[in-house]
Amino acid sequence: MRTNFSFDSAGLTIAGHLSTPEDAATGRRPAIVVGHPASGVKEQAAGLYAQRLAGHGFIALAFDAAYQGESEGTPRGLEDPAHRVEDIKGAVSFLSTLDDVDPDRIGALGICASGGYVVPATATDHRIKAVVTVSAADIGRQFRQGADDAQDPSIIQGMLDAAAAARTAEARGEGVGEFAIFPETEEQARSLGQHGFEGWEYYCTDRARHPRSAKSFTWNSIDRIVAFDAFRFIDLIAPRPLLMIVGTEAVTRHMTTEAIANAQQPKELYWIDRASHVDLYDKDEYVTPAVDKMVEFFRAVS
């Protein structure tokens, strides 16, 4: 069962979908906060995982990031890593108030960029007892260096120039402006390589297109993103357990392997054979083993 809920995150109202089990079991249940990828909304990958987790007996909350989807915040389309981390903590606070949630058994799941946001959230919020990432991405690193670490350094310098100009425009009472996240055509998307194309295919075709999913970010997102280091304090998660799930064909897989190498025990790296980064958003042959693994993981610690 899925119900609409809202909660506070640093003064903004965040829109969420709470997925609950259909069975009639009584007593307090473990709960999972589920964060969506950058540009995503709760109706896409995060909602899918939340519903699947509910099918295994967990209460799961998928929500729209501040400034995006149905959540509050202006300018629309702002991607603010610090606030994204705060959103996760706000979701934990909300779950802690529910009568059917055991506040001592709350975990977090982050997909793509949220895989990079749940790490600092968990590192600094001891209410989160276990954390899982799927296709984790450090959004700051990705903007600085590209998904494959091969980006021309001049690209981010140019974007930072635009971000600086946007802040000046904002101070003058003008609009901050925005930049497109995805190309307009399939041909343009294919020219970006595997990672660029599969992101376009997921967000911009009937595969998973959603009217509230962001197709652009504000220019004043850039300097916030570039200053963010998702895995800098991953060692602080211990002694709480960490599971990182990634596809063997994901262009971003090096971010997961490097991050978990710097984490302390207990930790586990779990590979999904033949899966790409975005395959793990919605393709059942890859999502099912990922869900089965995280259910086993969360049950062991809840």
What residues fall within each predicted segment?
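Short beta-strand element of the alpha/beta-hydrolase
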Residues: 27-37
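Alpha/beta-hydrolase-fold enzymes
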Residues: 119-200
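Short beta-strand/loop motif that positions the catalytic acidic residue
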Residues: 244-246
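Catalytic active-site module of serine/aspartate enzymes centered on a nucleophile-bearing elbow/loop
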Residues: 275, 282-302
